[in-house]
């Protein structure tokens, strides 16, 4: 029907290809008008097969280039009253709402349809709205999980390419680059198109914890895609070219050496090993000049405005020069003058008496990375720690966690003083390997209860709250295995780190029971203590069982310190007698993790345990009975990890109490019954009394099991091993101690016998000893 000159509206006829399946009018058609657009009920409208929309021509031609050309041009449709629109009905209704000024929310679920519709119909207002939403989401600096999922990102990238829109692909590459650590753990990571991945890796916003993470991710992608695509040799070379974006000079040496057999990475691995060894030979103060006039970008640790964590642990090639290079802007020309200034500055760092601050004023200003919260410099033995902390304080103002494990070139107390320059740091890890130095039994020093405790001095801490003394914010301190730690160091820690909540001094064999008790008394916020293989003894137990004082204007006392404990690991602490353990267990109602292995633990202590929140329990190599263990399991249904290897009395009626040994009797069936009835275990370690029949009773409890260890006195035969992957579908680790395995009528010696099992289990260890 032709339009008369007096008519200023047109009927838009839309066919709904996917109407909502409900009863509607027999003609399945509805007429609506843009006059009522504010009150449109889309749910009702979308039930109809055909929707006729009465819309004004002028508004359509003003806001849509498509309708401007169609209705205002020389097309035959321009004179018609009815125009057929073939488009997704819901999307088209949303486009009309935007044209007529109705509020419209762009979201992840409708962005692509709206953007595509806005492009097709030429609605600039909607295009701007889509661009604004896309930019806000993709450029947002908000922390937390990404709003866009990996598969959605892939769809958006493909859409941008198909519609020749550079705006979308560019932001997709940037978004993937800044969220690369999240993307690489996503199951859709291997489905990312090569061009998107390549643009992401080249993008200056590429954010990774380390080059090792980037390398692993790219190798996983290549493994998945080159096999599926059955690529030619030339195509494979193009694909592996992406690996050249990896900064191979700052990979860990062990990682690079381990990749020499990779079909994609072997050549780069050799180059990486050579480069690392060359860097290690260069003195720390001369690492920049010795490299000549080459581009130094490959030595920069990857830092961006989105970096939250950086890990350059186990890299002996990392020095102060490389750290300095990484926090300077890449636009700075590394000419001979700047190189000389850097060299002089680094040399002066080795001589504290020299005024290196005056030289530092000649250095270009360092960048600030506001989002970075965690740094790992463990095993970086050639890194000047004083400069490193100074650098962190300037360039990482939000730093909260410093991991500096396996570094022996600085005293613990000195490092804690240095960390004070980073005011927000709350967690410090200075642990070292303890296995070579822990004796079979730690000698207990000063464990006589008659010796004076610090409890009468703990009020001195009050002055710290009101004086001008500058205190550390450290709440989480790990100094495991530090043999340089003595009582005076613990006293410094207790005075300086008054907010300490977590303390790990495992293997600190030079500290005494009195020294440990002083820390417990002073640090009233302690909720987690790891004191395995130390002189933790009677004084420390007394300190835990004493009431903690209140400070400030408050009066009275807090509850006893033990009542606040959530984690207590005191394995191999022989200085605690049975009576003290019984008293301690009666006061630890909040415990979630408890380790009492190799202690004088007896049944009465477990019967006196007042808690119901245990998630981890280790009673290995103790004298407890199965009945006592069943009792504690019965009251702690949330138990996830149980270690009871080496408990010889586990299947007797009782244990050693007061020097009396109970005679052997029938096995305690209650234990496995309670485990199967009460718990959902993730890890278990058992020995004496454990058998294939025990595994059957445990079935309900081990559906989610991830690790199992069987020790001396227990048996786990071939049949049970073969059933493990079925019984425990999530199992990752199996450890067998002192197990005699008879397979095919011969003693097990051939590793290929276990090949079918290892296909389903991540790791299998067979230990001949403890």
Predicted regions and their residues:
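N-terminal BTB/POZ boundary and linker segment
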Residues: 1-58, 90, 97-108
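Solenoidal tandem-repeat scaffolds enriched in leucines and small polar residues
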Residues: 154-207, 212, 219-225, 432, ...
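Short, solvent-exposed loop/turn at the beta-strand->alpha-helix junction
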Residues: 316-324, 334-335, 343-360, 381-387, ...
């Amino acid at each position: 029907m032709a339009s008369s000159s007096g008519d200023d509206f047109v009927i838009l006829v839309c066919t709904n290809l996917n109407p909502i399946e409900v009863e509607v009018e027999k003609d399945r058609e509805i007429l609506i008008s843009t006059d009522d657009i504010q009150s449109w009920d889309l749910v009702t409208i979308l039930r109809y097969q055909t929707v006729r929309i009465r819309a004004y021509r002028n508004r359509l031609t003003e806001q849509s280039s498509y309708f401007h050309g169609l209705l205002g041009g020389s097309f035959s449709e321009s004179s018609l009253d009815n125009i057929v629109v073939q488009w997704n009905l819901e999307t088209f209704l949303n486009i009309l709402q935007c044209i007529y000024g109705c509020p419209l929310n762009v979201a992840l679920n409708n962005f692509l349809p709206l953007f595509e519709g806005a492009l097709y119909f030429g609605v600039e207002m909607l295009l701007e709205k889509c661009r604004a939403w896309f930019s806000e989401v993709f450029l947002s600096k908000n922390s937390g999980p990404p709003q866009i999922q990996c598969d959605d990102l892939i769809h958006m990238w493909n859409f941008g390419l198909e519609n020749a829109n550079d705006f979308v692909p560019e932001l997709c590459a940037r978004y993937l680059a800044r969220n690369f650590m999240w993307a690489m753990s996503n199951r859709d990571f291997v489905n990312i198109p090569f061009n998107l991945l390549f643009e992401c890796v080249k993008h200056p916003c590429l954010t990774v914890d380390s080059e090792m993470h980037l390398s692993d991710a790219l190798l996983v992608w290549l493994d998945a895609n080159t096999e599926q695509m059955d690529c030619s040799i030339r195509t494979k070379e193009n694909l592996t070219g992406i690996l050249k974006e990896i900064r191979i000079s700052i990979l860990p040496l062990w990682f690079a050496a381990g990749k020499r057999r990779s079909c994609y990475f072997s050549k780069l691995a050799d180059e990486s090993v050579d480069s690392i060894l060359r860097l290690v030979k260069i003195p720390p103060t001369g690492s920049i000049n010795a490299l000549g006039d080459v581009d130094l970008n490959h030595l920069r640790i990857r830092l961006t405005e989105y970096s939250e964590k950086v890990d350059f642990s186990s890299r002996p090639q990392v020095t102060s020069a490389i750290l300095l290079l990484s926090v300077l802007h890449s636009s700075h020309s590394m000419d001979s003058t700047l190189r000389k200034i850097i060299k002089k500055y680094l040399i002066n760092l080795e001589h504290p008496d020299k005024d290196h601050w005056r030289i530092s004023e000649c250095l270009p200003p360092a960048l600030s990375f506001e989002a970075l919260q965690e740094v790992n410099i463990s095993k970086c033995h050639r890194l000047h720690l004083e400069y490193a902390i100074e650098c962190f304080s300037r360039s990482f103002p939000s730093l909260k966690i410093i991991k500096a494990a396996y570094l022996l070139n600085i005293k613990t107390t000195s490092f804690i003083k240095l960390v004070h320059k980073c005011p927000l740091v709350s967690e410090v890890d200075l642990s070292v390997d303890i296995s070579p130095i822990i004796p079979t039994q730690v000698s207990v020093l000063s464990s006589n209860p008659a010796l004076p405790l610090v409890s009468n001095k703990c009020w001195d801490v009050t002055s710290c709250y009101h004086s001008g003394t500058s205190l550390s914010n450290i709440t989480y301190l790990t100094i495991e295995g530090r043999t340089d730690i003595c009582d005076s160091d613990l006293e410094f820690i207790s005075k300086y780190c008054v907010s300490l909540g977590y303390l790990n001094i495992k293997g600190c064999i030079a500290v005494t029971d009195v020294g440990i008790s002083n820390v417990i008394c002073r640090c009233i916020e302690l909720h987690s203590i790891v004191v395995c293989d130390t002189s933790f003894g009677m004084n420390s137990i007394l300190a835990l069982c004493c009431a903690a004082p209140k400070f400030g204007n408050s009066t009275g006392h807090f509850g006893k310190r033990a009542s606040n404990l959530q984690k207590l690991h005191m394995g191999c602490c022989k200085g605690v007698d049975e009576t003290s353990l019984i008293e301690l267990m009666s006061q630890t109602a909040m415990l979630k993790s408890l380790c009492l292995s190799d202690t004088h633990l007896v049944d009465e202590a477990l019967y006196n345990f007042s808690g119901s929140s245990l998630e981890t329990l280790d009673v290995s190599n103790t004298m407890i009975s199965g009945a006592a263990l069943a009792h504690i399991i019965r009251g702690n249904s949330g138990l996830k990890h149980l270690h009871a290897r080496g408990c010889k009395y586990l299947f007797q009626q009782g244990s050693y109490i007061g020097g009396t040994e109970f005679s052997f009797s029938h096995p305690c069936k209650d234990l496995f019954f309670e485990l199967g009835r009460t718990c959902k275990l993730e890890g278990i370690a058992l020995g004496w009394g454990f058998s294939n029949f025990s595994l059957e009773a445990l079935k309900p409890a081990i559906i989610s099991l991830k690790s199992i260890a069987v020790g001396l006195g227990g048996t786990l035969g071939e049949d049970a091993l073969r059933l493990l992957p079925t019984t425990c579908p999530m199992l990752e680790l199996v450890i067998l101690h002192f197990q005699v395995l008879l397979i095919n009528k011969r003693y097990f010696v051939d590793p290929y016998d276990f090949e079918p099992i290892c296909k389903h289990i991540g790791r299998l260890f067979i230990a001949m000893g403890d």
